Amino acid sequence: MNSFSNEEFDCHFLDEGFTAKDILDQKINEVSYSDDKDAFYVADLGDILKKHLRWLKALPRVTPFYAVKCNDSRTIVKTLAAIGTGFDCASKTEIQLVQSLGVPPERIIYANPCKQVSQIKYAANNGVQMMTFDSEVELMKVARAHPKAKLVLRIATDDSKAVCRLSVKFGATLKTSRLLLERAKELDIDVIGVSFHVGSGCTDPETFVQAISDARCVFDMGAEVGFNMYLLDIGGGFPGSEDVKLKFEEITSVINPALDKYFPSDSGVRIIAEPGRYYVASAFTLAVNIIAKKLVLKEQTGSDDEEESTDRTFMYYVNDGVYGSFNCILYDHAHVKPLLQKRPKPDEKYYSSSIWGPTCDGLDRIVERCNLPEMHVGDWMLFENMGAYTVAAASTFNGFQRPTIYYVMSGPTWQLMQQIRTQDFPPGVEEPDVGPLPVSCAWESGMKRHSAACASTRINV
């Protein structure tokens, strides 16, 4: 395998016949001979490209603006910038990151309805004009700090069927929307469109239909007030892995007819979205090492459900936890499932087990209960679908460092990226033949891992 670090990408370029699985196994073998068996990620950039092609096919009218907050790793942002996505930034720092990679301000939306004045001024000074708002106070701030801004009115949605609800904090009602549009007109601030977010982990695609219908109402209000609105932002909430009840294409099959009904292609309205986890969740797999182990009595398991515990119960402590990558358990309603790096014997007995992080906090529990064969200090566990809302919010609490990320890319992936960069595929094109691209996509048929039966099973998306 050749490891390249050039001006644009710092990753392992896979020789023909090698996969992301090989990189993971190679890294485990390398560190197994050292004392520092630190946790690490393998991130497959081919998986991200595959998601992009899938997006173009499923939502041909919708331009993706990647939600940087989801995973702000520089290599990820570089990759998405190279293939032409826009960017949803929530702060000055995210804008700086994106623009440092040469992304023009026209490909950025400052999608935070509540912004610090100094950061509004920063956006103004650096050419970022598109930004969201949902209150009169925000209008007044923008009028003073960035009078040439192109504002997008964030409306509230029914997010009652989402895992992570957002409308409790953001979004104007339809009644308030008219008042805000009238106030914006008085302030001579240009409102160019409407945005919404149905919530992360949306389980009912009809929520998108209602939100798109509501956006149409606000467009009509804007026309009555005197605005020529031309941008619709349908937000995020798209799944990033396949282990979900509602698949990506099930959602898009509902969105597309709604867009055609309320914003037909000849309406002149540009449509964007803010996918985050969709692009990165399945690209990342985390490898953690068991640093300690305890055999405990039933009443000492730390489980909230003692009835299913057995007399022989194990507690395993690993070198990443909820203050690190697994913060998604606390903040993103995630449920994670460990996979075993070593193949268990066919007749191996399984025991009730729990998995804990390395910090001194009793809150640092990753999996409350699962069935595992007896593991040992130095053994490895793998966690798939760990690319979204993990590394971005990880801390160094107790002095534990964030895991290193090893990026991989196959030759066909690199070639296709160059083709996209030079030809700038427009939305709606037929998906190019990626040939052997899937060999570099993490955790497909080439990587069948051994799954533990756990009470906590999946990451919500």
From Swiss-Prot:
Catalytic activity: L-ornithine + H(+) = putrescine + CO2
Stacks against the aromatic ring of pyridoxal phosphate and stabilizes reaction intermediates, annotated site positions: 197
Sites bearing N6-(pyridoxal phosphate)lysine, chain numbering: 69
Active site: 360
GO CC annotations on file: cytoplasm
Keywords linked to the UniProt accession: Decarboxylase, Lyase, Phosphoprotein, Polyamine biosynthesis, Pyridoxal phosphate, S-nitrosylation
First-tier enzyme category under EC: lyase
Reported cofactor(s): pyridoxal 5'-phosphate
GO terms (BP aspect): putrescine biosynthetic process from arginine, via ornithine; regulation of protein catabolic process; response to virus
Phosphoserine sites (modified residues): 303
Residues annotated to bind pyridoxal 5'-phosphate: 200, 237, 274-277, 389
Binding site for substrate: 331-332, 361
Activity control mechanisms: Inhibited by antizymes (AZs) OAZ1, OAZ2 and OAZ3 in response to polyamine levels. AZs inhibit the assembly of the functional homodimer by binding to ODC monomers. Additionally, OAZ1 targets ODC monomers for ubiquitin-independent proteolytic destruction by the 26S proteasome.
GO molecular function, one term: protein homodimerization activity
Cleaved signal peptide residues: none
Enzyme Commission identifier(s): 4.1.1.17
Pathway: Amine and polyamine biosynthesis; putrescine biosynthesis via L-ornithine pathway; putrescine from L-ornithine: step 1/1
InterPro entries: Ala_racemase/Decarboxylase_C (IPR009006), De-COase2_C (IPR022643), De-COase2_CS (IPR022657), De-COase2_N (IPR022644), De-COase2_pyr-phos_BS (IPR022653), Orn/DAP/Arg_de-COase (IPR000183), Orn_de-COase (IPR002433), PLP-binding_barrel (IPR029066)
Protein family (similarity comment): Belongs to the Orn/Lys/Arg decarboxylase class-II family.
Function, in words: Catalyzes the first and rate-limiting step of polyamine biosynthesis that converts ornithine into putrescine, which is the precursor for the polyamines, spermidine and spermine. Polyamines are essential for cell proliferation and are implicated in cellular processes, ranging from DNA replication to apoptosis.
Assembly mode: Homodimer. Only the dimer is catalytically active, as the active sites are constructed of residues from both monomers.
Descriptive protein name: Ornithine decarboxylase
Source organism per UniProt: Bos taurus (Bovine)
Lineage of the species this protein comes from: Eukaryota, Metazoa, Chordata, Craniata, Vertebrata
Name of the gene: ODC1
